[in-house]
UniProtKB/Swiss-Prot annotation:
Phosphoenolpyruvate binds at K24, G93, R121, Q166, R339, R380, K405. It comes from Saccharopolyspora erythraea (strain ATCC 11635 / DSM 40517 / JCM 4748 / NBRC 13426 / NCIMB 8594 / NRRL 2338). This is 3-phosphoshikimate 1-carboxyvinyltransferase. It is found in: Cytoplasm. It catalyses: 3-phosphoshikimate + phosphoenolpyruvate = 5-O-(1-carboxyvinyl)-3-phosphoshikimate + phosphate. 3-phosphoshikimate binds at K24, S25, R29, S164, S165, Q166, E308, H335.
Amino acid sequence: MTQFWPAPAASGAVRATVPVPGSKSITNRALVLAALAEGPSTLRGPLRSRDTELMATALRALGADLQDGPEGSWQVAPGPLRGPAEVDCGLAGTVMRFLPPVAALAEGRITFDGDPRARERPLDAVLNALRALGADISGDSLPFELQGTGKLAGGAVTIDASASSQFVSGLLLSAPRFEQGVTVTHTGEPVPSLPHIDMTVSMLRAAGVEVDDSKRDVWHVAPGPIRALDLDVEPDLSNATPFLAAAAVTGGTVTVPGWPERTDQAGDAIRDILARMGATVELGPDGLTVTGPAELAPLDIDLHDVGELTPTVAALAAFASGRSRLRGVAHLRGHETDRLAALQRELSGLGGDVEQTDDGLLIEPRPLTGGNWHSYADHRMATAGAILGLLVPGVLVEDIATTRKTIPDFPGMWSSMLGAVD
């Protein structure tokens, strides 16, 4: 039976400090590197959510030893990679795209499957690349099977990563363990979400791996050891954006502690986005503080590199003082759901005026009314519905539990934030 969550309306300007759990992107990259490292690693402040638990469970199945440490940390000791093993990807793009290269280093049969929607998501780029590098794989999408020999030759490979930067990151993360390393060349439309590849490169270098990304659309990773990690995981900045948006739309003030001064996280772009919409944005020792304006300004913005922020920005644009254009996000049609079609459908269902373009959305603010907001098993669609519900009474968000994909207790955090209003 479908469950609908009554999105709470704000009774005034939100004023709150909202600690946000660790970054999913950093946590899942760190787990892969730790499983392939030359010694035991410690991850402090990792995200504990469905996506990261799926990654941890899969790495255990492949041979890594992951134990709970003090204060929510993870202790990871690498072990011989071997099958037979079964990997449940759920709906986690990082699991379905980062772990096939790891499994190619294992000895034995590894099978991959996931949620029904995951079977529709593109995987052929990474699977064909692995075949070209010497892997034995049956299938081009979930479910598929990989027969490993305990090693992979590696070498040079050309892929089309225009559907997802995760195709590149997945190959790079395991490449130090390939006999020849890897040289990945992208051909096709521009790679989306480049900050995620920058994050992968930074984390590899921090682990002592030699990476050359000096040439556009070409990445070379040399073979060699991966140093053990001793890592404090940053807060998840993309997951922080709905809470900062709450300040923006209610004219309130929200602080997210621990916001890094420098980061490769795509979510850091929310600072510029909110400032362009008229909010006051301050980064200081207490974290990032956003104070909403009297009126939100519309914006024309290319979100190609930060497409994951599109649902949050679309919700903000629905309350702006004029028409907004969100560009550069055609690749969102292949995410957890077709996010462009979903945003148009759901905003229109509440009375909005939304038009799809070739690569984005045109949003003309209109008076909105309550109604059902379908999440399509997409965590960012669900949080966008919560933002709208702050100012639109009667918004009912379908399956708010889907937010557990990346936030362990979004409803509780949202309610706590709304407990502090003027």
